């Protein structure tokens, strides 16, 4: 979220600590339920009390942090995809072997972009939609949950065969297991997102994961 601590966020107007991806996902998913209780409410984390008492509003810094962080992830993935096309790589003298590895990175970036849109769909129900084909700085159309669901599903299904097999990638990089887990989570709540249950599809992805050798 920054290189020099909470006071140097790469998101304007947002403290880096309030927009750390894993933190805000956990806060919004858990502190808003009875799964976790904050033992003190008078600390420095403004907005925690409102989350766990379900009295938050649009000014809550964790909601702003989550939305902004997810949209930044979309923007970063889009820019990586713009800068790593075969045409750009050829013009920069990148070897054929390196281009093959970069193509895998491109598909991983698409999966991370799908993750960001998943959280926007899940937490907010809508978001501005942009891909690498849109000009930088242009506000995209607002997509609702059904549109975001369709994009996430089609994107993950398209790139799934191109990702590395489960547990074969470098540490810290995603693989087919990531894509299947995100598909499973998307299908699990499909009835909420699009009004159509997809439990069979969810179970199929979970079965693939279970049989992937994880312990």
Regions inferred by a protein language model and the residue ranges of each:
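Polar, glycine-rich mid-to-C-terminal structural blocks
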Residues: 191-192, 203-215
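Short acidic-aromatic linear motifs embedded in glycine-rich loops, typified by GG[WY][YF]DAGD(H)
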Residues: 1-108, 112, 117-123, 128-134, ...
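Short coil/turn linking the two alpha-helices of tandem helical-hairpin repeats
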Residues: 121-123, 128, 167, 189-195
